[in-house]
């Protein structure tokens, strides 16, 4: 079974979230993340994906699990990371742009999987709860 993970970055100073514009044919907006390799733990894979996609090391940040979605072919884990200030991500070739946006002002089009995650009441409630902590 394929395992993937993504992470919401939330800036305390601006109350905004980081989104990345994918370079694939659909050019949808997503969050940092990707496939976890067979020899990695979930957190090791998430750390690697953040280094590869936005050149940030999250190994010393508090990472909070938000959701696990499971179907017949894959498992997708969603995480949350609060940062003090917005940062400028150094993008790899998987992305061609980024934006820090306010909640409920998400860029469009969202990647379909992320759209479903954001519109899941439990995820919205968890994000709201941990934004304030």
Predicted regions and their residues:
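Conserved N-terminal beta-strand and adjoining loop/helix that marks the start
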Residues: 1-17
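Short connector loops at helix/strand junctions that flank enzyme active sites
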Residues: 2-4, 31, 73-76
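Active-site beta-strand termini and strand-to-loop segments that position acidic
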Residues: 9-13, 22, 81-83
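Short strand-connecting beta-turns/loops that link adjacent beta-strands
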Residues: 12-15, 24-25, 72
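Short, well-ordered strand-loop elements centered on a beta-strand within folded domains, enriched
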Residues: 14-21, 86-91
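N-terminal first-folded block
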Residues: 19-32
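Unchanged
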Residues: 36-118
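Charged phosphate-binding loop/patch that engages nucleotide di/tri-phosphates or the phosphate backbone
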Residues: 115-133
């Amino acid at each position: 079974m394929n395992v993937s993970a993504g992470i919401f970055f939330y800036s305390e100073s601006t109350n905004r979230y980081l989104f990345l514009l994918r370079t694939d044919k659909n050019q949808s907006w997503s969050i940092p993340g990707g496939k976890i390799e067979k020899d990695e733990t979930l957190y090791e894979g998430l750390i690697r994906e953040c280094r590869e996609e936005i050149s940030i090391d999250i190994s010393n940040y508090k990472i909070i699990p938000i959701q696990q979605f499971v179907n017949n072919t894959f498992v997708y884990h969603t995480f949350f990371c609060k940062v003090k200030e917005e940062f400028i991500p150094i993008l790899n070739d998987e992305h061609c742009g980024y934006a820090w946006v306010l909640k409920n002002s998400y860029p469009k089009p969202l990647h379909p999987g992320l759209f479903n995650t954001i519109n899941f009441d439990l995820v919205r409630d968890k994000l709201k709860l941990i934004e304030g902590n």
